[in-house]
Amino acid sequence: MKYFIVKRALLPAVLVMALMYALITCDNNDSNVAVHNPDQSIVLTSFKPDSGRIREMVLLDGDNFGNDASIIKVFFNEREAKVIGSTGKRILVAVPRLPGDTCILSVEIGKQKKSYSGEFRYKKEASVITIAGNGIRDPRIFDQGLDKAQMQPMYIGADLDFNIFLGDQSDVLLRINEEENLMQIIATRDQGFNHRCQVIVNPSTNVLQMGAEGNGNRDRFAFFDPKKGWAMTYKFVKEWDDNGYTRPAHSGFIANPVNGAPSGSPNSFETHYHCLYCPIDGMYYTRYHSGAIVRIDPDTWKAKIIGMTPMGIAYGVAMHPINQSEMWIGYDGVADANTGIYAHSISKVDVLDDRVGLEDTPVGNAKILASFQKLSAQSYVSGHRDGPLYQAQFFNIRGISFDPDGNLFISEHGNSDIRMVNTMSDPMMVETVIGIPGVAGYINGPKETARFSGNHGLVADQEGNIYVSDYNNNRIRKIAIE
């Protein structure tokens, strides 16, 4: 039934494409076959319409395109569009997904590439539905179908087979499959699972990976292999190379608590929520609350501290899918006392660059890596501001995740909304894709009316769908952004 519905939904689009291609073919009155002449320049004159949504058709007029669509490339900014056909003087293309709010259209044929004057405005659409949870937390119900599930969702991940993995606050890890209407317990507290540890999927092996929380767990990492039914197994660091840095360790208690942390709160510098994979060198990387960035050899389980970032809690950490050595860090606002200007911020660091930068920083005399950059506004004040990332403000970042195109999605617990950073634009731009900043609630539907409440983790799957742990609403929400 689902396959039939999808096919029906695609049918009108196919008909539109066929009709429009027929129209542009009829527009060419030249009976001769149009062949691109590489010795002459391509000519760009105009395009229409000047705005549209994903998969809508755009006509590009000019000359010397040729009618061989296979040699023609069309770009909306840096995003390549699907070329439907060409008459030699007119090209028909489909608008690609999320190319940017304002786009420069360019045509590339062989060694020639030219851009149209004027801009194309991309019309983004976002909507949200609920895929799991009836809004009730207790008693926990995991085995009666997704619509009857009762839970309190925290952090969330997605594998390459469209399974969703959820950490419930009761320290239970769940596998969710929409197609099967299934919620399955994978790990429990008795096995050592902690709900704050985000499940990260290794893009090379599809194995789930996570770090560990709390003092005494510095060397521990957990793995879940789908080939073994996601049975949880542990790996431990066997040898440390401190590399001149201080090894993460329990350091007593916060002396000057801020952001509501009670006096005497444990300073758990041994906590490392994530286990990330870098495809460039095949190593694992993690970040400790102390700020240490650690490289781990998955064959020998030897760990090396490659450098420091400012200390503090970062629930959301992710590797960039295009700039694959970049670790992006979302600092939360209830971090340790010394986090200072890095609270509520988006930052990044290159894990393959171990050069030391600043010796003296606002967070003490740590040798911060030279590649570390705070990218959002130069203030620790929480808030909400869209626009260029260097001016943007956030409030309690609890989860970050990249889609395959390098768009960074951010779950803000404090603002009860979802933000997006186009990390491939210059400057990088931030926008609120769904939810009303500072207005909590529970409403499904389009961007203009949708509501979240105290959302925590989020993850983008391979197709760009966003799954959100809607913490206060006790539900899992799914966002389609196009």
Question: Residue locations for each model-derived region?
Answer:
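C-terminal motif of bacterial Sec signal peptides marking the signal peptidase cleavage site
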Residues: Y21-T25
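Residue-level detector of Asp-centered blade-edge/turn motifs that repeat once per structural unit
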Residues: A158-D161, V201-T205, Y277-D281, M319-Q324, ...
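Conserved beta-propeller blade signature
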Residues: N163-L166, N206-G211, G282-T286, E326-G330, ...
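Loop/turn-rich, solvent-exposed surfaces of beta-rich toroidal or solenoidal domains
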Residues: Q393-N422, I434
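Blade-level signature of beta-propeller repeat domains, shared across WD40, Kelch, NHL, RCC1
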Residues: P446, S453-E482
